[in-house]
Design a protein with these regions (language model features):
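Conserved hydrolase catalytic core segment
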Residues: 114-156
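Catalytic histidine-centered segment of alpha/beta-hydrolase-like enzymes
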Residues: 277-286
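Active-site loop/oxyanion-hole signature of alpha/beta-hydrolase fold enzymes
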Residues: 76-119, 123
């Protein structure tokens, strides 16, 4: 169970759950695009990169990275409605990740982007994989930051049926909806999400400012989603970054083997372990993430 919460980082309040004011005017996208599920702002110039945050996260979890990248790349920072203080819109009910992936695909098409790179952290990684597998013609490169393609199998016993996973997801959703303010599991997991103390209040604020039903439904969707059968449809060069969860009861070698097995359906994917980092690699090891992203952009 502890393992599950960690990986769900973005699926948790984790993915950078920070509640932020509207972006400055110079960050606002000048591209006409309307959606009741996501919004996008742009920064910088150069090859296009779409950055997708995770559960309960604001796009500002990418701010430090964006500061370093905007001189070389044009960044498209996605915000999923319902998280970190934003009204849920169409995300008030039902699935969140799959519809968000479709909306990002529509954004790419309607704004005329030419197969941009897509980078997703935690739940954002799930969204990015959905987009790359279901619309491979739209994605030029793909980076998944600390997210397996089948979250449910990471915290259920080996051999569990899809129905058993769904029952677990139902239970977790009910728990999120019933939790008293400030006592939810996400808040309890924040210390294991980043080593940078100054970033933890951001994650707490994002979690507390998120729409409860949107969070619960998004988390449920992540648990029951298994993208392993779809990985072979991804044609873009792909990099997967992962960390060993703190206090993990699983030996490192076993965990590494599990991650590689999970991505066996994407044989061209480069699976990279990031040392000395918790779930928010963009906070704990930004230089390493940037180096891996630059390498991916050269592929």
């Amino acid at each position: 169970m502890k393992r599950f919460f960690f990986v769900a980082g973005a699926a948790l309040t984790l993915a950078g759950c920070s509640k932020s004011p509207a972006p400055p005017a110079d960050q606002a996208s000048d591209r006409p695009f309307g959606s009741d599920r996501i919004s996008v702002v742009t920064r910088g110039s150069g090859p296009d990169i779409v950055l997708v945050p995770g559960l309960d996260s604001h796009r500002d979890v990418w701010d430090g990275l964006a500061d370093s990248l905007e001189g070389r790349y044009r960044l498209h920072l996605v915000q999923v409605n319902g998280f970190a203080g934003l009204a849920p819109g169409a995300n008030a009910n039902g699935p969140v990740s799959a519809p968000a992936a479709e909306e990002i695909g529509r954004y790419i098409t309607e704004t005329g982007l030419n197969r941009p790179a897509v980078v997703g952290h935690s739940m954002g990684g799930t969204i990015a994989m959905m987009l790359a597998a279901r619309h491979p013609e739209l994605v030029g490169r793909l980076m998944v930051v600390d997210m397996p393609p089948a979250l449910g199998v990471m915290f259920t016993p080996p051999g569990s049926t899809a129905e058993a996973v769904r029952q677990m997801a139902d239970s977790m959703r009910a728990g999120i909806l019933a939790a008293a303010p400030g006592t939810g599991m996400f808040e309890q997991m924040v210390p294991t999400m980043t080593k940078v103390d100054s970033m933890r209040p951001m994650l707490l604020e994002g979690s507390r400012g998120s729409h409860r039903a949107t969070t619960a439904n998004a988390f449920h969707e992540l648990i029951v989603t298994d993208l392993r059968p779809e990985l072979s449809r991804i044609t873009a060069p792909m990099t997967v970054l992962y960390v060993l969860p703190p206090n993990s009861p699983i030996p490192l070698a076993q965990y590494e083997s599990a991650m590689r097995a999970a991505y066996a359906g994407a044989p061209s994917a480069q699976i990279v372990k990031i040392e000395d980092s918790y779930h928010f690699i963009q906070f704990d090891q930004p230089g390493r993430l940037i180096a891996e992203l630059d390498a991916l952009m050269r592929r």
